[in-house]
């Protein structure tokens, strides 16, 4: 009886490992589209104005379900090569169609209207991530 229980345990452990490996391989093979947005704000933009913009951008993943992942941050590089760009927003999509739909989505368009009065420069780069 102990032998049967032990073998059943080994079988379950093997299945668990097999499923985990299969899931990991699946994730590795599925490329994602990164949408990187960098902002430089006009001199008249106050900390409150910038905070409003940060909050509006951070709200987009809750309003647009096509966003697969989202990160953001403020430049802290000691290299001083940012050319005035201070904020980076990193948005991940599963497809170009998802990205294209996001760009014309009413929530994204509303965000752009909040941003416009305070934006001096934007740099946007989209790429397919390679591992």
Model-derived features: positions:
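Bacterial Sec-dependent N-terminal signal peptides
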Residues: 1-25
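Short S/T/G/P-rich N-terminal loop/turn motif that feeds into the first structured element of a domain
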Residues: 16-85, 94-101, 127-131
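Amphipathic alpha-helical protein-protein interaction surfaces
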Residues: 46, 104-108, 120
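C-terminal partner/receptor-binding element of secreted or periplasmic proteins
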Residues: 118-124, 131
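C-terminal structural segments of small proteins and small subunits
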Residues: 99-102, 107-109, 113-115
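Alpha-helical structural signal
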Residues: 34-35, 87, 108, 115
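A common structural junction motif
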Residues: 58-61, 109-112, 119
């Amino acid at each position: 009886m102990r032998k049967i229980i032990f073998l059943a345990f080994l079988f379950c452990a093997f299945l668990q490992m097999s499923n985990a490996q299969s899931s990991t391989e699946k994730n590795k093979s599925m490329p994602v589209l990164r949408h990187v947005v960098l902002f430089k704000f006009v001199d008249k933009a106050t900390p409150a104005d910038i905070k409003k913009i940060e909050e509006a951008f951070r709200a987009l993943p809750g309003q647009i379900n096509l966003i697969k992942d989202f990160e953001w941050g403020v430049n802290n590089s000691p290299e001083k090569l940012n050319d005035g760009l201070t904020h980076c927003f990193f948005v991940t999509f599963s497809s170009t169609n998802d990205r294209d739909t996001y760009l014309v989505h009413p929530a994204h368009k509303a965000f752009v209207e909040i941003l416009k009065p305070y934006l001096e420069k934007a740099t946007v780069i989209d790429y397919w991530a390679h591992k």
